[in-house]
Amino acid sequence: GSPIMADDPQEAEDIVSICSALVLNMGTPCERTFRSMLAAGKEANKRGKPVIFDPVGAGASAFRNELAATLLREVSLSVIKGNISEISFLTEGSGTTSGVDAHREALSTENNLNEHVRLAQRLSEKTGAVVAISGPIDIIADSREAWAVRNGHPAMAALSGTGCMSAAVIGCHAGANPQAPLLSCVCGMSGMGICGELAHER
């Protein structure tokens, strides 16, 4: 993919018109980006383009919570990708978000894998989106099917921004395969994990 970033409402619709997919990232929200994301999301829906939502920090502030709730309500999302804290908040209205990182004790492991799959599937049923939960084991699920992706390296957790990169990679796959959001998510998350493995080796 060839990326472009925009956050002004005046160009949101124009930028969406030339993109294959839209990634909405809640990393640095403000009133302007709130309006931009809403306008861009609605335009992408109108044009039938996949929308990937990365609810960075959902649950950390009332403003972020309002933005996330508005996007869930007013935009048809193809993919929601977040850490376990963010996905828990979107699903249940509660969580342990205190920054962009998930709390270590909440991360997906073999012991809680089924519980986290059910959480992802509940949010998928609620929104119609494929849900990806990033962590030591990445979980990708829709309401009928779930995948566990075990690629990656623990060092990736120490690098801020890898989650945002993953959302962009998913966007590239979804833009090329707009009718296959689940497969796009699996390819994006596993590909990002493989990149982390190779980077650590080098």
How would you describe each model-predicted region?
Residues 29-32, 57-61, 139, 156:
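Short, small-residue-enriched loops and turns at beta-alpha junctions
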Residues 64-146:
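Conserved phosphate/ATP/ADP-binding segment of small-molecule kinases
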Residues 1-47, 53:
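Active-site cofactor/substrate anionic-group-binding motifs, chiefly glycine-
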Residues 33-82:
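Glycine/small-residue-rich loop that forms an oxyanion/phosphate-binding "nest" at active or ligand-binding sites
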Residues 89, 159-191:
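Short, small-residue alpha-helix embedded
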Residues 149-161:
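Short pre-catalytic strand/loop immediately N-terminal to key active-site residues, enriched for Gly-Thr
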